Amino acid sequence: MTHTLRVIFAGTPEFAAAALAAIHEAGFPVPLVLTQPDRPAGRGMKLQASAVKRYAVEHGMTVAQPPSLRRAGKYPAEAADAIELLRTTQHDVMVVAAYGLLLPQEVLDIPRAGCINIHASLLPRWRGAAPIHRAIEAGDAETGVTLMQMDVGLDTGAMIEEARIAIAPDDTTATLHDRLAADGARLIVDALVRLERDGTLPATPQPADGVTYAEKIGKHEAALDWRKPADVLARQVRAFDPFPGGVATLDGAAIKLWAAEPVAARGTMANAAPGTIVEAAPEGVVVACGSGALRVTQLQKPGGKRLPAREFLAGSPLAAGQRFALPDVD
């Protein structure tokens, strides 16, 4: 089916690319795609295009990559050029998903139907940059995707629609991301169909209660503090997969932990100091925590690959009594 509603799309990572693909495949014209500039990535630190740019180029879409959309920012000339491009590109609505750049009021006012954001949380919980990570880390039972009419605040716009999903006990940010991306893609296509048909999308202001913020994930958060309860550390490991990983330091080597589950402390395990390896078996490496213990079932040594505990121990033996370092506490 071919639609007449013209959509400018702004987004950067895979989460956004799923939405762009759905919009394109549904038959909506996309006269312009905005995405962040290419960034150095990988071991060779070569410039790499975003997932959104790769999809857009592959499908013959016009792409712009301004470093900023704020005239008062570090790149006023580039911002002015991008804003002029938005003004001269005929369109009806802008869809924004994990774009990574702030949209000033001047930009929000350009599309006739405004700017619709796809946000990976149940707003107003987890406004901000890392809603998927923080939902898992906090032990939330459910999360979802919210469509909102954007304003200049940080994810404060009126809500158009949401979809809820349960967070499974073994969900990682990677697995939850993929399900949320699919839901976001479905929601935005449905919303655009209604917007084209009705000319408007009713929206409800966000409640004042229940606001939390999902701060951007920093590499400094990767270090596991074994003084914490085992269930908290297990959530951290799941939340930080695929980035930045949970890091445990042993004899100066940073070992990444990719899969772990809390287990009850039994016998002498209950008296072991936090960070102490109490068992190193093919089924997993069990480490004493502030309360309970953590069975680690997937590990990665520096420069190596993710391996099940059995394979990791075959090449890098660990033994009961060894102790992972405790990070400094601010």
UniProtKB/Swiss-Prot annotation:
The keyword Transport does not apply. (6S)-5,6,7,8-tetrahydrofolate binds at residues 121-124. Keywords: Protein biosynthesis, Transferase. Disulfide bonds: none annotated. Its EC number is 2.1.2.9. The keyword Protein biosynthesis applies. It catalyses: L-methionyl-tRNA(fMet) + (6R)-10-formyltetrahydrofolate = N-formyl-L-methionyl-tRNA(fMet) + (6S)-5,6,7,8-tetrahydrofolate + H(+). It holds the Pfam family Formyl_trans_C. InterPro entries: Fmt, Formyl_trans_C, Formyl_trans_C_sf, Formyl_transf_N, Formyl_transf_N_sf, Formyl_transferase-like_C_sf, GART_AS, Met-tRNA-FMT_C. Belongs to the Fmt family. Attaches a formyl group to the free amino group of methionyl-tRNA(fMet). The formyl group appears to play a dual role in the initiator identity of N-formylmethionyl-tRNA by promoting its recognition by IF2 and preventing the misappropriation of this tRNA by the elongation apparatus. This is Methionyl-tRNA formyltransferase. The gene is fmt.
